[in-house]
Amino acid sequence: MVVKAAGLVIYRKLAGKIEFLLLQASYPPHHWTPPKGHVDPGEDEWQAAIRETKEEANITKEQLTIHEDCHETLFYEAKGKPKSVKYWLAKLNNPDDVQLSHEHQNWKWCELEDAIKIADYAEMGSLLRKFSAFLAGF
């Protein structure tokens, strides 16, 4: 059975440059990802993405412009089980400070190449490149 999760790849525009928000997990190996989490019973991926972003970074749907037509699903193994994570691209309209939950210990705004390096796995790099290309044509 595939474990389903969802999240938002949040970006901001600062001095004409695009930066992506990454959160660092509180538990080893302390990986960096956009806000995301498991889909709860009775929820769809969209609802989970919105809820998890609020829980993990204290960013609400009202603070975002979500590009509903720009989304991608990643598939990989986590803890020996197949997992899918659907991400939508979202702009933070007023980039206030992020407020982390206990699940994360740090956060960063990163330009594309730095975000790819810090996320440190190929699928996330491909996703960030795809979303960056979408924004270049937006």
UniProtKB/Swiss-Prot annotation:
Changing Y27A: No Effect on substrate binding or catalytic activity. It is an enzyme of class 3 (hydrolase). Coiled coil: none annotated. It catalyses: P(1),P(4)-bis(5'-adenosyl) tetraphosphate + H2O = AMP + ATP + 2 H(+). CDD domains: NUDIX_Ap4A_Nudt2. Divalent metal ions. Mg(2+), Co(2+), Mn(2+), Zn(2+) or Ca(2+). One of its GO terms (biological process) is ATP biosynthetic process. GO terms for molecular function: 5-phosphoribosyl 1-pyrophosphate pyrophosphatase activity; ATP binding; bis(5'-nucleosyl)-tetraphosphatase (asymmetrical) activity. Keywords: ATP-binding, Calcium, Cobalt, Hydrolase, Magnesium, Manganese, Nucleotide-binding, Zinc. Disulfide bonds: none annotated. A motif (Nudix box) lies at residues 37-58. Its cofactor is Mg(2+); Co(2+); Mn(2+); Zn(2+). Asymmetrically hydrolyzes Ap4A to yield AMP and ATP. Monomer. This is Bis(5'-nucleosyl)-tetraphosphatase [asymmetrical]. It comes from Caenorhabditis elegans. The lineage of its organism: Eukaryota, Metazoa, Ecdysozoa, Nematoda, Chromadorea.
